[in-house]
Amino acid sequence: LHRDSPLIDIRWLTSPATLHFAGAILLMRIVLAEQTVGASNFFQALGIQNEQTLPLYGIILCAILAGGVTCALLLRPGRENWFYGTALACVALGAWLDSGATSQTRPHDIWLSQALVAYGSGLFLPAAMAQGMGSAIVRGPLYILSFITVFLFTQSIGGLLGSAIFGTFITLRTSFH
């Protein structure tokens, strides 16, 4: 804390704006873990094999790429909040569409809902990265490492927490049925 140019600026990392940003992308990463853990564990619990879910994962990949392309074409400084809102709406709609899943649900039944979640993911992460990196660049090159530290930490911890939460939920729910 008492260096002229620290490798990682603790004051900036603990500022309200940075903590708000980190909290938001951490929560979004936890929510997005549903797609990687929830859907795959759900189908695994139903006895559906990997080759039966291959088209679903192809659709998810295409939707993520579409979200990234949309960001590349439309994202400009100051528009990030629009992307956040749209991403959240896509994820919420996809989750709502999946809320009626039963033991009769098959991978083709959730193509649209999982595509919406994937598209939302493709919209959110590039916009968050651009906003955070822009904020770090404005402050100077030393803040870039601090931003990368925050971003990678939140994505790693969020993915682990999300996997643990959704995996535990699925295990508990399947033990009751």
What annotation goes with each model-predicted range?
Residues 1-3:
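C-terminal membrane-cytosol helix-exit motif in multi-pass small-molecule transporters
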Residues 7-175:
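12-transmembrane solute porter fold
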